[in-house]
Structure formats: C-alpha cells, structure tokens
Amino acid sequence: MSDFDALLANYTSKETPKVHGVICKCVDRHGICPTPHLAKRDLRLTLLGNEIYSKVAGYDSVLPGASPLREDVVLKVASATKLITSIALLQCIDKGLIDLDEPVTKVLPEFDQKQILTDVSGSDLVLEPSKTPITARHLLTHTSGLGYPFTHRLLRLRAEVRNRAGVSPSLRVTERYEMPLVFEPGTGWLYGCSLDWAGVIVSRLHGGISLEQYFVENIWQRLGLSEPFPCFNIARHPEYNARVMGGAIQTPEGRLQPKDHWAFDNPEDQDGGSGLSCTTKDYVAVLADLVSDSPKLLKPATIAEMFTPQLEAKSPGVQMLLGLRPAWDTVSGPIAENAINHGLGGVLCMDDVPEIDQPKGMLGWGGASNIVWWVNRELRVAGFFATQQAPFGNPSVTRLVNAWKKDFWAQFKTIDHA
C-alpha cells in the first residue's frame, strides 16, 4: 500500500471520514503499458486516451445508509463547468463566428456602454464609463473586469445595497450577472461571471440553442459519449438525478454533515460558469481530447493557445491573480508566486512544483464541490479529482489532492515513454 493509498483509506473511512468519497483518474494519449503498480485496476482504453491511473474510495454520502462509492456516480462539478464553456467559445472562434480579440458587443449588446464601479458610498454607487470593449479573450482569461460579489468588495457592497432596496435577485444569467465592471478590461484579473456570459455568446451564435443542447451536439456526441448526457438543471433529469453523489460540508470542528443544496444549483437557467452535472467518464473524455494527437473538439493551434500565458509578467493582472490564491491553490499545489499565470480556460503553472513532483506546463481549475482537473499538454497526460464536499480547498481535500498528484507523478516517471 502506497502512502497515498493509506491516506486515502484513512480520510474516507466510514466511521470518521474527513472526505466521504473520492475519485481520482489520470489518462494519457500514448497507449503505453504502465508498470504493474501504476493503477489498482487493469489498464482500460477509454473513449479517448488510456486510463493509466484509477482510484475510487469512500462512500456516496455521509448518511448512515451510504453505499461504497461507484465511479459512475453523477457529480455536480460547479466551476469546472467553465472549462467546457471555454471549449465551446473556442469552437465558435475555430468556426470563424467570432474573433478572439474582437468586441463581443455584436453578440452581447448588454456589454455596450459598460461602466466601472469605483466606489460604494452608503447607497450610492460611484461609476465611470469603461473605454475598452470586452473581447472573448477577456472572458476566457477573467480579465474582463467582471466579478462575483464574493470575489470583490465593491460588488459585495453593491449586492447589499440592492438587497436593502428590495431588488429581487434573478436566476436568469443575463439578469443575474448584469453588473458593472471593477476595472478596465485587460488591465487586471478577477474571478467572476465571464464564462457565464461566454455561455450566452455560444447560445446566441447558434440560433438561441440552449447551452446544454450545444454541449450535447458539439462536445459529448463528438467525443462518442451516449445518453444520458451531462446536463444542467439536474432535477429535471430524474434518471440522472437518482445517481447524484451526496454532498457534505465540513464543520469548523472537522466533522462532515450532509449538504443537500449548492449555491450553483440553478433551476431557471444554464450557467456557463457553473451548474453542470456529469460523470467522471464524461469529464475525463474532454481532458483526454486536450492531450490527444488528433483532437476532436478544437484545432491543435487553438489548444496550444490555451496553454500560452495570457498575463504579462509582474502585471497588475498577475498580482490580482495572486491575491485570490485561495481560488486556485488546491489546483496548482504549493507553486512559487513567480511561476503562476493564466491560460485560455484555467490557471497555468509555469514551473515545476517539487513538493508534489508536479512538472511545469499544467493548465487546471476546479469547482466549489472540490473538483480538480489538470492537463499537461507537453507530457500528454491529464488528471481529474472529484468529491462533493464544501468548503472548497479545505485542508483535508487539499492534502489529498497534493498527495494524489505526488503519487501519480512519482509513478508516471517510472514509465518508459519511448
């Protein structure tokens, strides 16, 4: 038993779980044969790539009648939805429907004459006109100036002002995220609703088709997946909903309690930034395509651009990215501050992370339910870690993610890749 296996067994024990259930998968594009100890199970050919690492541990809920976790459980992947939406928007660029660096106002008139929120004084919002049009690149890199109320003080204060005024919050994407910017597009970085708006662009460029249906026709079916497909509004899909892994929340004392509702559950609309439900197989098929020699979803040059640093070194954008390290630290691992950047679709690790044996060149992100995905295009390998637990990046999950990576990379290096 490896150190990670021992830690995983301890953390997912039914009696005193720190994380009630975990799925870890890694795939590559090689067709290589792993050393006997590389995976618990035999090497299996997946829809794309080879599954070279697979561990499933723990239970499907924290309730007394919980069953051992199965790898075909349905997961609410939260902000890991953003990668799928990023790919969808990049497909629009590959098709010539929109350019990466042209203003998106021709598709999103809501972005015409955007204003920048510079202060909130009592109930008064201090606003000034924005001079820079928002582009698809801005949306894909979180440099648009758009945020979430929980990621920026001024947006939080604005939400409080609206709440005191009796403004009822909407769940429609175009109303929920109709908010001012907090900096001039392209001059900073802020985690926010950029990909939710990207989903609206994808829908409008295809005649108003729902984002869910676009994903079915242009992502899931293209990868060879079959029904039931990943979906939004999972309550409307009873056969899929019945397989959802139970959620949990870790108390300040470290105990786990059931969690039935997530903030990203949206019964009224399809958020490109969150809200997707899928299986591990579904998501890993996307990751495998990004490391494939013959990708089905995007042009190779477009995939290469995803892995290109989009923020200037030492720029305000990089400093703002570092200022929100809790949003991505569980994804990146203990990386040096001068080695972090952002690509098209995720945080980009520009150097090795020796503490966990992680090589440079990793693109990744995650989701509030403690989903973590990463792709190393140069080494043609990708990984996926899943549980259904809040809060994101809590110490128990972060330790498991780092230990998983270290276990995988140590074993990956023993393979003959010739």
Curated annotation (Swiss-Prot):
InterPro entries: Beta-lactam-related, Beta-lactam/transpept-like, Diverse_Enzym_Activities
Binding site for substrate: 176, 191
E.C. number(s) listed in UniProt: 2.3.1.-
Gene Ontology MF terms: acyltransferase activity; hydrolase activity
Pathway given in the UniProt record: Secondary metabolite biosynthesis
Residues the record marks as active site: 79
Biotechnology comment: Calbistrin A has been reported to possess a number of interesting bioactivities including antifungal active against Candida albicans and cytotoxic toward both healthy and leukemic human cells.
Primary enzyme class: transferase
Keywords annotated in UniProt: Acyltransferase, Hydrolase, Transferase
Family: Belongs to the class-A beta-lactamase family.
Protein name per UniProt: Acyltransferase calJ
